[in-house]
Design a protein with these regions (language model features):
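Unchanged
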Residues: 85-182
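Conserved Nudix-box catalytic region and its N-terminal flanking loop in Nudix hydrolases
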Residues: 62-101
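Short, solvent-exposed loop/turn segments that connect beta-strands within catalytic domains
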Residues: 59-64, 130-134
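Acidic, metal-coordinating catalytic segment for phosphate/diphosphate chemistry
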Residues: 3-53, 59-61
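Nudix hydrolase/Nudix homology domain
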Residues: 2-4, 75-76, 149-209
Length: 209
């Protein structure tokens, strides 16, 4: 596998063979600068081909899934954590790396590690950008369980994590609403908020929330 595309057919086939209930859905969004071109919104730079999103819970997503906010985000813009998949890097490698960098927790099978429960699905985007033209991207959404008694301890200061929240899964649509209305307080972050809202609605649907 060359692992250069946002959705590599062979890689997705292997993931769906492991988690047969997972599928690929598509979404289209018209966007403009500074989304994809401005500081902190460079989604497709650093050789990123796609991203993972981990939906971390402590035993029951209905009781709480982990959200974070970065120090440079608009006020109140908490969201599900994501991390860029580099060209040549496998989706599951990225998942392991990003969870450790952002939380200090290790993915594995033992009781003191984060357990990957399943792939909820892939959301493929066709972004129509006023400057860049058509841009393809994708988010791979994984449901993972945090080990009992674990403490969140970010390892990479460049992640700039400013805080955490635990929110019941049924709040994810409300979280999406907040992200979509970021444009009211900050036009600079408007398209970023609209884009990020899509993942939260997708996850809410997959979890039946």
């Amino acid at each position: 596998m060359r692992l250069a595309l946002s959705v590599d057919p062979e890689e997705v086939a292997l993931l769906c063979a492991r988690w047969p209930d997972a599928g690929v859905e598509s979404a289209a969004l018209a966007v403009a600068d500074p989304f994809l071109t401005g500081e902190h919104q460079l989604l497709i730079t650093d050789r990123r081909r796609a991203e993972i999103c981990y939906i971390m819970h402590r035993g029951d997503p209905a009781e709480g899934v982990l959200l974070h906010i970065k120090t440079f985000y608009p006020a109140g813009a908490y969201r599900l954590p994501t991390g860029g998949i580099h060209v040549g890097e496998a989706v599951l490698e990225t998942l392991t790396r990003e969870i450790f960098e952002e939380t200090g927790l290790t993915v594995g099978e033992s009781g003191d590690t984060v357990r990957v429960e399943r792939l909820l699905g892939v959301l493929r985007y066709e972004l129509q950008h006023t400057t860049l033209g058509a841009v393809s991207f994708a988010t791979y959404h994984f449901l993972v369980q945090m080990p009992a008694g674990a403490v969140l301890d970010p390892q990479d200061p460049d992640e700039s994590i400013g805080g955490w929240q635990w929110r019941p899964a049924h709040d994810l649509r409300a979280v999406a609403d907040v992200l979509e209305t970021v444009q009211v307080s900050s036009r600079v972050w408007a398209d970023w908020g609209r884009f990020r809202a899509l993942s939260h609605r997708f996850v809410a649907t997959q979890l039946g929330a």
